[in-house]
Amino acid sequence: HKAPYRFVYPGKVYRNETTDARHERAFFQYEALIVDKDFTFSSGKVMIKSILSKVFGRDVPVRMRAGFFPFVEPGFEIDMGCLVCGGKGCSVCKHVGWIEVMPGGTPHPNVLKAAGLDPDEYTGFYVNIGLDRLVMMRYGVDDVRLFHSADLRFLNQFR
């Protein structure tokens, strides 16, 4: 296949980490990658805002912070205003009113070279969409661990 590329692929991620209200050892995500000659970082930012407004049925506060991921340059982390507490601060957002929902960035030139593409000709946009956190925000769930619990009273809400 030749560029341009547009991929969206789902997956379940397993991590060896301590669990808390925002972190679980296993979670679901979508990864999206666009590689094209004219796809800009600004286009990616518009795409992110569009995804979030579709998921939540309205515009939500969004901010982008610099972040490091070895396969993108520059890298960023996308935060949205915490909908569990309305941005006032809670255990989900660590009392700051924001929660990270998507890391991403522009594919690193070495990634493009490894795909047989000239990084001077092609650019792109990568984002990792954490579904569990988006569902937390959409339904006001204050603990991600509940999704993997055996509590049928909680789980039956989502039939």
Task: State the predicted function of each range.
Residues 1-159:
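TRNA-recognition modules of translation machinery and tRNA-sensing kinases, especially anticodon-binding
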